[in-house]
């Protein structure tokens, strides 16, 4: 399985944790993490939320492939077991984590699924680390590994 995570961020403040879960996931799947941040996004974020969201969408469009999942606070809440079932039979997964302003509704609706990790607003850098842990947990559930108790 190929797992892709696309995130609007310049750097990874949670790099140590991200690397830990990336290594664990590599036992089950090929993982590609791409931090998308360019000059257009930086300028748009200084203008307003609408322009920022448009710039995120433009940056993400070339990466829409496989089963696409938006991380969205208005998305569906799943248990870890439900999440494991959701990703179980997919050949390729692409997760999209918006920047400070989130993602446009139209972009979210164009994807296959909208996932909420929490009703709380979370820093997008933290969301990526939390998502990596849940992906690893899902692989453990699907492979009867004792990590998920």
UniProtKB/Swiss-Prot annotation:
A GO term from the CC aspect: cytoplasm
CDD domains membership: RlmH-like
InterPro entries xrefs: Alpha/beta_knot_MTases, RlmH-like, tRNA_m1G_MTases_N
Record's catalysed reaction(s): pseudouridine(1915) in 23S rRNA + S-adenosyl-L-methionine = N(3)-methylpseudouridine(1915) in 23S rRNA + S-adenosyl-L-homocysteine + H(+)
Gene Ontology MF annotations: rRNA (pseudouridine-N3-)-methyltransferase activity
Entry keyword set: Cytoplasm, Methyltransferase, rRNA processing, S-adenosyl-L-methionine, Transferase
Subunit structure: Homodimer.
Family: Belongs to the RNA methyltransferase RlmH family.
Name of the protein in its database record: Ribosomal RNA large subunit methyltransferase H
